Amino acid sequence: MNKWKKILMIEYNRLPDIFKNLKSKGLYYSLESGMFDWQFNGVYVFHLSCRGTTVYACYREWDIGPDEKCPVTNVGYFNDIRSEDDLYKIVDYKINFYSECLKEFKKRKIEVKKQELNKDFEAT
């Protein structure tokens, strides 16, 4: 069993502190089917999994329709993850990236809402 899968199988209360600290960033995860699933304020963000020697992140685009498939992105190779620090760097980078995506998405939604309200106002 490789190191990645071992990390995935560690029980919640024995997980490294950095994973427990994700809650302070407004994110949380669940251990399900050997994957870490992150959600941001209740919105599914992405999960990390390992197939062979490649680490993948499967994530939802903020504005995709319900019929669109969840895109899968290669976020690194297992051979490049020589320590837990390497794993944390990948995770931390992804969390920051998706946090920014969510902020942008909310901003866009607010802009669209304002435009709709303006149209309604002009029509009356």
Predicted regions and their residues:
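Intrinsic disorder/low-structure terminal segments
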Residues: 18, 27-28, 35, 39, ...
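Short acidic, low-complexity intrinsically disordered linear motifs used
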Residues: 104-124
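Intrinsically disordered, low-complexity regulatory segments enriched in Ser/Thr/Pro
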Residues: 37-97
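Negatively charged, low-complexity tracts enriched in Asp/Glu with abundant Ser/Thr
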Residues: 1-40
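N-terminal Sec-dependent export signals
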Residues: 1, 95, 101-111
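Residue-level detector of alpha-helical secondary structure
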Residues: 5, 12, 16-23, 88, ...
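Generic alpha-helical secondary structure signal
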Residues: 16, 23, 32-33, 40, ...
